[in-house]
């Protein structure tokens, strides 16, 4: 029989587990009469890897920019680790690592000098910088290229450098926008391996329009189409009739999973 102390500890751990590390609450973004997103709501909890899936033009990047504080919502609230990213962005940013689709890389720098620059900008002392850089380099498997100019690296390695930059301050939350975009199969495998390592200790939201990425890296999927959320659930629950994820995606969005085409209309780029 559990003691009173053990019961309190279990309840405390359970309550911590239920605090959302990423929260989108009714997020809408309007440009004149055009709505990039409409009332998008979802939560990502500690230890989850969640795929944010949708065709190009669905509103994924807009939602991620709002979640990271780079864009203010027209309506709704975005929170990181409980901090409102519109009114308390600095506190939220300390908990957040963000990799946009085009990462903040300086081609003339080496991965080491870039990471040192970002660590310095975050006010780390010499010992902390050394430790954080070594840890980020190990997590992202950059040891073999750490002193090579970034403009000499493959796109796969540049993507890993971007991830290392997002990790330099040891954030609890990672938001990654199309982390495998434009990579070849070998580079994609490398990024997937990095994601598996990171998923053991971080809360991760990654956007993608590639169904295979969801199956390879995520525990749960949030699906968006035409600016609206159309699905939010566990991977094991999304396909109870075993049609395959392609068929489920087509049923929910009305789009062909491979071409992104609805009837005869091309989907615009995000």
List PLM regions with ranges:
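Conserved ABC ATPase "signature" region
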Residues: 116, 120, 127-145
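A short, proline-enriched helix->beta-strand linker immediately N-terminal to the Walker B motif
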Residues: 168-172, 201
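Catalytic Walker B motif of ABC-type/P-loop ATPase nucleotide-binding domains
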Residues: 174-178
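Helical segment within the ABC ATPase nucleotide-binding domain
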Residues: 188-200
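A short, surface-exposed alpha-helical micro-motif characterized by mixed small hydrophobic
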Residues: 214-216
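ABC ATPase "signature
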Residues: 232-233
């Amino acid at each position: 029989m559990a003691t009173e102390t053990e019961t309190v500890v279990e309840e405390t751990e359970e309550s911590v587990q239920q605090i959302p590390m990423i929260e989108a609450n009714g997020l809408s973004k309007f440009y004149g009469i055009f709505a990039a997103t409409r009332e998008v709501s979802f939560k990502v909890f500690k230890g989850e890897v969640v795929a944010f899936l949708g065709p190009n033009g669905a509103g994924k990047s807009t939602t991620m920019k709002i979640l990271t504080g780079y864009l203010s919502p027209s309506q709704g609230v975005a929170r990181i680790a409980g901090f409102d990213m519109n009114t308390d962005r600095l506190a939220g940013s300390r908990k957040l690592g963000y990799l946009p689709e085009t990462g903040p890389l300086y081609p003339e720098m080496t991965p080491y000098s870039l990471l040192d620059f970002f660590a310095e900008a975050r006010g780390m002392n010499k010992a902390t910088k050394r430790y954080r850089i070594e840890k980020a380099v190990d997590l992202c498997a950059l040891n073999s290229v750490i002193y090579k100019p970034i403009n000499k690296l493959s796109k796969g390695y540049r993507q890993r450098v971007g991830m290392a930059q997002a990790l330099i301050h040891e954030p609890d939350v990672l938001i990654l926008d199309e982390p495998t975009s434009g990579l070849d199969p070998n580079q994609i495998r490398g990024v997937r391996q990095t994601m598996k390592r990171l998923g053991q200790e971080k809360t991760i939201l990654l956007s993608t329009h590639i169904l295979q990425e969801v199956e390879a890296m995520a525990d749960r999927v949030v699906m968006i189409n035409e600016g609206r959320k159309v699905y939010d659930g566990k991977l094991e629950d999304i396909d109870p009739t075993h049609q395959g994820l392609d068929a489920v995606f087509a049923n929910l969005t009305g789009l062909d999973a491979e071409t992104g085409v609805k009837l005869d209309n091309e989907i615009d780029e995000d």
